[in-house]
């Protein structure tokens, strides 16, 4: 419930732009959010393994 409330709180436009922070669009996690995708590293990894994100694949060398 708390995470849901924080997601709603993050959607509101703050009075000052410096108070804005990124939050994952899928799970609501506030840390390690990739700006390009708008999702956290955990969700990004999961979606990449499923092949849901076009052009993104796991690196191997």
Curated annotation (Swiss-Prot):
Its cofactor is Zn(2+). InterPro entries: Ribosomal_uS14, Ribosomal_uS14_bact, Ribosomal_uS14_CS, Ribosomal_uS14_sf. Part of the 30S ribosomal subunit. Contacts proteins S3 and S10. The keyword Cytoplasm does not apply. GO terms for biological process: translation. One of its GO terms (cellular component) is cytoplasm. This is Small ribosomal subunit protein uS14. Belongs to the universal ribosomal protein uS14 family. Zinc-binding uS14 subfamily. It holds the Pfam family Ribosomal_S14. Zn(2+) binds at residues 24, 27, 40, 43. PANTHER family: 30S RIBOSOMAL PROTEIN S14, SMALL RIBOSOMAL SUBUNIT PROTEIN US14M. Keywords: Metal-binding, Ribonucleoprotein, Ribosomal protein, RNA-binding, rRNA-binding, Zinc. Binds 16S rRNA, required for the assembly of 30S particles and may also be responsible for determining the conformation of the 16S rRNA at the A site. GO terms for molecular function: rRNA binding; structural constituent of ribosome; zinc ion binding. Binds 1 zinc ion per subunit.
